Amino acid sequence: MNTRQSSFSYEEILICGRGEMFGPGNAQLPLPPMLMFNRITDISETGGPNDKGYVRAEFDITPDLWFFPCHFMGDPVMPGCLGLDAMWQLTGFFLGWLGEAGKGRAISTGEVKFTGMVTPKTKLVEYGIDFKRVMRGRLVLGIADGWMKADGETIYKATDLRVGLFQEKAD
């Protein structure tokens, strides 16, 4: 029976950001302001469209977030690359949560589509990562599709998100 934790609070994901969750030299999340979600609401190594696992997370949007004043002055919009980065962050977190070793690095994505935007009027962003494959060899590689919703409407989709875990070579 799986006894892994299936959700994480903001305080718990900050522990991961400090490198204290999965052990030294292993996957960690960025710290604020680059951390792009406030909580992981559900994570499982089974289920999802491919029955290979999934992650669900949320980000509370407030008008005072750091990116709104500079992107763009007079026309504030969350940069699309931050939503994409959140998907990579969650993909890497999943690999560490599985117990895999190494530092997480985004490798690539297939196709990305933006069909809406996050503005200061948005209240909640939701993320979904649906795994297609986890490869465990010299390199641990997670491959997943992702989506992002703003107030319930899907506005970003990404296919074939790839994150690898890399172990440092001994000198």
UniProtKB/Swiss-Prot annotation:
Active site residues per record: 71
Domain of life: Bacteria
Lineage of producing organism: Bacteria, Pseudomonadati, Pseudomonadota, Alphaproteobacteria, Hyphomicrobiales
Gene Ontology biological-process entries: unsaturated fatty acid biosynthetic process
Keyword Cell membrane included in the entry's annotation: no
The protein's name in its UniProt record: 3-hydroxydecanoyl-[acyl-carrier-protein] dehydratase
A GO term, aspect molecular function: (3R)-hydroxyacyl-[acyl-carrier-protein] dehydratase activity
Catalytic reactions on record: a (3R)-hydroxyacyl-[ACP] = a (2E)-enoyl-[ACP] + H2O; (3R)-hydroxydecanoyl-[ACP] = (2E)-decenoyl-[ACP] + H2O; (2E)-decenoyl-[ACP] = (3Z)-decenoyl-[ACP]
Organism of origin: Rhizobium meliloti (strain 1021) (Ensifer meliloti)
